[in-house]
């Protein structure tokens, strides 16, 4: 169900992603880049685990165990294609820098002044639509389904998603009250630039939003099935 939901990415964010042809053109060099690296070294720098006997790199992504065969770099289970590409870029770029507890907006990334700041603004609008009409309990359940942990913060709810081993994403939510609608913001670790580019970071945010929406759809379908 999650994969089905991911393939139906929100129309706004669909328009921001390249077409399938561009994906295929990007996939080839991404695989070539990691093929020239030692799997042991990749694991050490990225937080993945290399099972040498099986020729498999294993990591966690949003509460899902992902196994990547080496040297083919094929994925099991099969992920949405942009999710695969981001992981390949992560494995190639990771330098082992410790995760910083300091959070930043996408606009605070190395090359984020224009692209990241725009993404922050657009994502706030998308999150406001996503949160509209949902109870705090419903939001917590959706976040938990993606493996989120909850942390203390200046927000009403702060969910920390482990998108990749050294690449957490914070979702801060302020619940609706008599004066304001519910709102949310995404944040990354100050160390994020050591693992992914600005464009990849944007793709991470888009994938996370699509996964949240997919969980919402799954819960709605389950509720309807239970009523039959």
Which residues fall in each region the model found?
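Intrinsically disordered, low-complexity regulatory segments enriched in Ser/Thr/Pro
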Residues: 63-89, 174-199
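Generic detection of long, well-ordered alpha-helical segments
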Residues: 77, 132-136, 198, 202
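Amphipathic, interaction-prone secondary-structure segments
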Residues: 41-70, 149-175
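Domain-length accessory/inserted modules outside core catalytic folds
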Residues: 57-58, 113, 117-128, 152-155, ...
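Conserved binding-pocket/active-site segment within a compact domain
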Residues: 132-194
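Alpha-helical oligomerization segments
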Residues: 177-228
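Acidic/proline-rich low-complexity IDRs
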Residues: 1-2, 223
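Short Lys/Arg-enriched alpha/beta "domain-start" segment
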Residues: 2-54, 83, 90-147
């Amino acid at each position: 169900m999650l994969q089905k939901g991911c393939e139906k990415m929100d129309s706004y964010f669909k328009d921001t992603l390249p077409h399938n042809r561009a994906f295929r053109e990007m996939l080839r060099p991404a695989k070539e880049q990691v093929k020239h690296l030692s799997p042991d070294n990749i694991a050490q720098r990225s937080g993945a685990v290399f099972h040498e006997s099986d020729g498999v790199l294993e990591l966690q992504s949003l509460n899902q165990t992902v196994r990547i065969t080496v040297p083919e770099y094929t994925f099991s289970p099969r992920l949405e294609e942009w999710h695969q590409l981001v992981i390949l870029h992560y494995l190639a770029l990771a330098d082992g820098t410790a995760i910083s507890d300091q959070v930043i907006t996408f606009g605070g990334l190395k090359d984020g002044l224009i692209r990241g700041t725009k993404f922050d603004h657009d994502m706030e609008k998308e999150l406001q639509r996503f949160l509209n009409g949902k109870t705090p309990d419903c939001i917590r359940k959706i976040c938990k389904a993606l493996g989120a942990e909850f942390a203390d913060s200046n927000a009403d709810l702060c969910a920390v998603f482990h998108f990749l081993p050294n690449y957490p994403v914070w979702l801060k939510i302020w619940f609706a009250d008599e004066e304001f609608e519910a709102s949310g913001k995404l944040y990354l670790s100050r160390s994020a630039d050591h693992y992914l580019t600005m464009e990849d970071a944007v793709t991470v945010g888009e994938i996370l939003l699509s996964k949240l929406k997919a969980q919402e759809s799954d819960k709605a379908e389950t509720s309807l099935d239970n009523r039959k």
